[in-house]
A protein has these predicted regions:
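Short, compositionally biased leader-like segments
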Residues: 34-60
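Charged, amphipathic alpha-helical segments
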Residues: 51-72, 133-140
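Surface-exposed ligand/attachment interfaces on beta-rich extracellular proteins
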Residues: 58, 99-110
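Mature secreted bioactive peptide module from preproproteins
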Residues: 67-68, 80-84, 123-127
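A short catalytic or substrate-binding loop motif that flags glycine-/basic-rich loops and adjacent residues
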Residues: 74-79
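Short beta-strand scaffold segments in enzyme catalytic cores
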Residues: 80-88, 152-155
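Amphipathic coiled-coil signal-relay and dimerization helices
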Residues: 91-97
């Protein structure tokens, strides 16, 4: 696991997510992000503990926080991550999830399991951490896109690009995704 969460537990109005240093003595790395919704990371820690450290997911209506956590986690780990957004009559909720696997991530239904998320999926993004991996949707990704009206994209970590795909085309277009704002803007959420 490549992340360290520091919860301020009432001492602060935000949580901070750190990358891992890669050593056992000093767990916390030198990169971090602030997360305003203090329930997002604490919820992810609870779920991760329940699943022996391998699977986690969290939800928030703060799309900025969700995009920040997704991008930071994708950029600072070897695992695939996903970011889904649901629309319930104008109220949008994001889900951030991982299975801590380098070559697949849980589907949207599995990621939502145990979370109070309502509405229709409007965005489905997952990361491809392998620099030699697919720049766009894999054959499995495209097959899964058939049943969803959501906008689908792969975040390719190596070049920080979102590659939109659908059920018939692995790569419709590439879009710069250097920041969480870029991700939200490119997917029509900002």
């Amino acid at each position: 696991h490549n992340m360290t969460i520091e919860s301020q537990r009432g001492k602060s109005e935000f949580d901070r997510l750190y990358n891992s240093s890669g050593t056992r003595k000093i767990k916390r790395g030198n990169k971090s992000i602030k997360v305003s919704d203090t329930k997002l990371l604490s919820g992810m820690v609870k779920m991760q503990t329940k699943h022996a450290g391998y699977k986690t997911a969290g939800s928030t209506q703060n799309l900025q926080d969700a995009a920040e956590v997704f991008k930071f986690a994708a950029d600072n780990s070897k695992a695939e991550w996903r970011l889904d957004v649901y629309d319930d009559n104008g109220a949008k909720t994001a889900v951030v999830a991982t299975k801590q696997s380098e070559d697949h991530v849980q589907n949207a239904d599995e990621a939502m399991d145990g979370l109070a998320v309502e509405g229709n999926q409007v965005v489905n993004i997952h990361s491809h951490p392998n620099p030699l991996g697919t720049k766009g949707g894999s054959s499995d990704d495209m097959r899964n896109a058939k049943s969803s009206p959501a906008r689908n994209a792969v975040y390719f970590k190596a070049n920080q690009t979102l590659y939109e795909y659908n059920s018939t085309r692995s790569q419709i277009k590439g879009m710069s995704a250097n920041t969480a704002d870029d991700i939200l803007r490119q997917m029509g959420l900002k």
